[in-house]
Amino acid sequence: MAFLWLLSCFALLGTAFGCGVPAIQPVLSGLSRIVNGEDAVPGSWPWQVSLQDSTGFHFCGGSLISEDWVVTAAHCGVRTTHQVVAGEFDQGSDAESIQVLKIAKVFKNPKFNMFTINNDITLLKLATPARFSKTVSAVCLPQATDDFPAGTLCVTTGWGLTKHTNANTPDKLQQAALPLLSNAECKKFWGSKITDLMVCAGASGVSSCMGDSGGPLVCQKDGAWTLVGIVSWGSGTCSTSTPGVYARVTKLIPWVQQILQAN
């Protein structure tokens, strides 16, 4: 019996910090409109990190995929002099138990193209591992064969601008629920700029905006939140009637696995 009890304890530990299952449940209104966003429940997106320069200025988002690795967008231009902040909700508060983590190595996808914005992904190897807790844990990565069909309601999070005209980004982490579009549908807005290395979401009254870049677009699969997109580009005015464009993670997984295995 004691052995069974031990097993059940391990099972609980697994679900506590297993990927894609927040210890603190997110609450979505479903009408959340990050332009027209809503505050997230503190700690409910535990993989969300803030990428900051040495002055503490937030310039991009990212996602923890393990204790040692963060995924973000290549166009963010992350350097080893930048820092990763995990466990943060309110950037205006000094009362949070955040983890400020140094970056040991930056792996920018060598096929990233600044003109086409294809392959917009960078992996960051942390100098010291993040300590997983109730408010810090990993998102699940998809398999290359996973299918997330158009119409799937997903969520993007970030500290990006809530209006493109605002001078400052919000202090509190914002969230927005938004549907995936087919690439054919997305091309009606963006034409030939859309490639199979991208996935679109939104045009539904919500939008990612400047400062959200590199952050997650997550969809639920088998009860766990899975990283489907990385905030990449969109309308310069963060129009909520135009879809945002995200790096399509299923297409980039082979490269991710190659880097993780070699390092």
Swiss-Prot record:
EC number(s) per entry: 3.4.21.1
Domain of life per record: Eukaryota
Keywords in alphabetical order: Digestion, Disulfide bond, Hydrolase, Phosphoprotein, Protease, Secreted, Serine protease, Signal, Zymogen
Residue numbers annotated as active site: H75 (charge relay system), D120 (charge relay system), S213 (charge relay system)
Catalysed reactions, as listed in the record: Preferential cleavage: Tyr-|-Xaa, Trp-|-Xaa, Phe-|-Xaa, Leu-|-Xaa
InterPro entries according to UniProt: Peptidase_S1_PA, Peptidase_S1_PA_chymotrypsin, Peptidase_S1A, Trypsin_dom, TRYPSIN_HIS, TRYPSIN_SER
Record keyword Oxidoreductase present: no
GO cellular component, one term: extracellular region
Biological processes per GO annotation: digestion; proteolysis
Coiled coil: none
Keyword Repeat: no
Residue ranges of every copy of the Peptidase S1 domain listed in the record: 34-261
Top EC class for this record: hydrolase
Signal peptide: 1-18
Modified residues annotated as Phosphoserine in this record: S93
GO MF terms, alphabetically ordered: serine-type endopeptidase activity
Disulfide bond entries: C19-C140, C60-C76, C154-C219, C186-C200, C209-C238
Compartments, record wording: Secreted, Extracellular space
Family affiliation: Belongs to the peptidase S1 family.
Name the UniProt record assigns to this protein: Chymotrypsinogen 2
Species this protein is from: Canis lupus familiaris (Dog)
